[in-house]
């Protein structure tokens, strides 16, 4: 009997040790263009409308990163950085016109080789056939909100319903399948919402009808002292279209006029045509009376801008409501399946977004609203609930973090840093003191010039190198980045010091893609294609 007892003791101890070392599941719940200031837990200017109660609960259960940034504020490149753990110039995907090289080393391949059951559902935006996944179904390109097509290993399929719901349905089935297999899983649940054009679920079409969305303080920014900002094409005033972006004045039969119309108008028709007659009936019933009132009002000037902002912001936030609800659905599934306690849940988005800030929509710039991206992580038993982190982190860190969480080997050529020490409350002494940024997509949509730059905990230096223009901001005294201090003689030594830091980062990351300043003739030609505002053309500062 004693012999049997001594034989069983090490077996029990081994079982307990194995249980402790059980690999955690990882859920990466990812959205498109969700600005941190459109999440209640970030305490931004939209908090009063309570846009994300479920994401806020996730933050209460885990850690919220207040200084989370992207390396290149545009959809495809941001996703490529996350997959590869390398800056755009290293992974080869610098703008949305590129195609991702799936043959390269990416973290899902490493996790799969380590025994993880892996899946990718929703928006990939990297082109090509996803690799490193046991299961996948992705939207072609940007994808559609209603009855979207999905690319799968079996071919192209039309999926009836609303995209955010559909992608979450796939994720839920994968979780149940993984449990049955008894394997740890890594799930990338990647939503189209709230990307342009903003089409909410039918159940949310009347959400916010009874309130006015607060306006950002910079809605009527005049871009003084910021020359590049004067030459963009992303203003709510001049570049947000009533048809394409706001879905007004669509003909009852959805017939496209024979006379050619701008592509921005056709897109609205194409989106609406995906709806079933039943879906379209509900949509028209919700928006018809509002559109009629808008036409009768005949708004102009600032009144028109304010109306467009309200329609845009409400549809944007309505799209986010679908994301918020589906996050709750997936978390409930984890609870119901008994998996929540061993599942790391990560919420993020590919970059930030302008929700009327500086009078804009879209992203791309190194200014705070598009540079910042949300990052919230729940890790039961590891992260202190309700904690907030102010260290400088980037999407460059995600690949290493996921590998570290799983106990997998981290390749030496990845360029980020694992966030696991920060999640455990142990900041390394050598943690970065600045982040590096580089945007490439020019000339292109919205006409945001190429630029690179550095951001420290207080200062930001931006180099619009093809135009030979620099900007410098003190984020402590000027958080809205309205005053360019680059030419201020009192800041000369400080700027030179930070410029040296920028060069050091650029060289350290091996970025040799910064181009020389272009000839004046080229600069003039490029900016002649944009609707330049002169001082006299700025909207007057009137109430």
What are the residue ranges of the model-derived segments?
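Residues forming the ATP-binding cleft of Hanks-type serine/threonine protein kinase domains
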Residues: 476
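Bacterial Sec-dependent N-terminal signal peptides
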Residues: 1-22
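Formylglycine-dependent sulfatase
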Residues: 15-465, 469-470, 479-500, 504-507, ...
